[in-house]
Amino acid sequence: MFNVNREYISKKRVIYNLYRRERANKMVEVKELFKNTEEYINKEVTVGGWVRSIRDSKTFGFIVLNDGTFFQPVQVVYNDKMDNFQEVSKVNIGAALIVKGILVETPNAKQPFEIQADEVFIEGESTSDYPLQKKRHTFEYLRTISHLRPRTNTFQAVFRV
């Protein structure tokens, strides 16, 4: 068999888990951002969630991110100054991301604020055939993908009642 240094692998796994736990402890829920906006405006925040929609151009892009804690998602603006701009631009709907950036007010836009991203970590990929797309889905269709129903707006609203 192969001579594997199990102690080295174990230490690496412990360090990685500590790193992830540290990031998770500093994350803010989307619900918290909407309830206490003034507390977070012009400050650095870290938010995690799933991509609801993504649009990009050559120099910047927009991600609509939802973590399931609030009915309204948060918009993330990212630009080509990020190291992984190309990777983030290719992310599909349903991918899990952790975004670190500055929360900025947007008084003339639909949403009250957005996150100007400094870093975007791709925690989990999603394929292009992910069944929940931006469009509205019928209940009949949602019955066929019962494991993903909690990620839809309709079922999130029902669960909050």
Walk through the language-model features, giving the residues of each.
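Class II aminoacyl-tRNA synthetase catalytic cores and aaRS-like
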Residues: 17-161
